[in-house]
Amino acid sequence: MGAHKADLFRYCYLYEFGGIYLDIKTELIKDIDTIFNKKSINLYTVICNSKECIYQGIIATVPKNPIFIDLINHILISVKTPINDYHIFTKYFYNKLKEIYGLEKLINGKMVSLNLNTYLFNEECTINLNDCNDGLDRYGFCCHVYDNGEQIIKIRYSDYPWLGVAK
């Protein structure tokens, strides 16, 4: 699947170079310097709306972060058989973080371990048309990323994949 190839590329690039990855459909509400500014954090990402996966449209990391080796290897092993679950890699990422931190579920905030300090934001989606100034997305949702209850990022433009764009 194309999305899974993009996941693999994203993981490889972030492992090698580090940096901040934002999906093209991401709109920052807060300044980027106020979002990724926590001390001693080497991985930022987002708990998806279902609370069972990682929203991979936002990932920030230091170069050579060892969690990405595990994520890359998981993709390479998994693609040897047909993949029926579109969210297989986002769920694996979530479960890997749970395993590292010895948690039953992940929550918004800072998590510290011997080799990995992570900060997690929350994705929250509603079906309320008034929550998004540009309307609901193609799935009928309005989704934002929150940090401790504060909206910091809007995700999923209502018109993505930009209907009406010339081909």
Residue ranges and their predicted role:
Residues 1-6, 22-167:
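Glycosyltransferase-associated regions of secretory-pathway enzymes
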Residues 7-19:
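Small-residue hinge/turn detector
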